[in-house]
Amino acid sequence: MRYPMSKLAYHRVLLKLSGEALMGSADYGIDPKVINRLAGEVIEAQNAGAELALVIGGGNIFRGAGLAAKGMDRVTGDHMGMLATIINALAMQDALEKLGTKVRVMSAIKINNVCEDFIRRRAIRHLEKSRITIFAAGTGNPFFTTDSGAALRAIEIGADLLLKATKVDGIYNKDPQKHCDAVKYSTLSYDEVISQNLEVMDTAAFALARDSNLPLRIFDIEQPGVLLRILHGEEIGTLVKERNSKS
């Protein structure tokens, strides 16, 4: 059942998933049960009337920065990481299509026999036609993370909200896994994140979001139904925005 768009707090969103989110309890690769569950969450949100774009990291398959630290050429490593994100995008496309929805994968690097090139106007048209759109290969440039790619694409498509899915239910003043007295923030401004040196996403990605006044919500993707609840305005996780923003 599709609900009226007016019932949603956010109509067009970009969801950033880490590659590790696809692994489940495994040490490498993609757990079919996990990716199918995540696909179900995305479909549920789409059925509520949302326009959904996704960016998926590649860390479950390859981390270019890690091997660069051990001597591999950084540019080569980052290009390999981009290919890993395409693998994950195709896997998610397959999982979503098996649930009966239309999906497009758009890559920042040319791989035309596999997926479309990223063209901004075409991406927006896909979203307007209720096609879930997955952006792969980051920004297409080395030295930029998939967080930066997610922030950039969210701005380009005019997203109402950038969602960063993690295994922690928000932003804390210190690591909640190490400190039992860690305090969770419900809302933060961009300046507060910077002044408190809180780790939200990499600096380039955060600067893009801040400069474009793009609201960012950090949340735990492992909670069932959480994506739909956020789209309907529930205060889940931590929202980062300018203090004068109404989002």
UniProtKB/Swiss-Prot annotation:
Its EC number is 2.7.4.22. GO terms for molecular function: ATP binding; UMP kinase activity. Pathway: Pyrimidine metabolism; CTP biosynthesis via de novo pathway; UDP from UMP (UMPK route): step 1/1. It catalyses: UMP + ATP = UDP + ADP. GO terms for biological process: 'de novo' CTP biosynthetic process; UDP biosynthetic process. It is found in: Cytoplasm. InterPro entries: AceGlu_kinase-like_sf, Asp/Glu/Uridylate_kinase, Uridylate_kinase, Uridylate_kinase_bac. GO terms for cellular component: cytosol. ATP binds at residues 16-19, 59, 63, 166, 172, 175. Keywords: ATP-binding, Cytoplasm, Kinase, Nucleotide-binding, Pyrimidine biosynthesis, Transferase. Inhibited by UTP. Catalyzes the reversible phosphorylation of UMP to UDP. Belongs to the UMP kinase family. This is Uridylate kinase. It comes from Xylella fastidiosa (strain 9a5c). The lineage of its organism: Bacteria, Pseudomonadati, Pseudomonadota, Gammaproteobacteria, Lysobacterales.
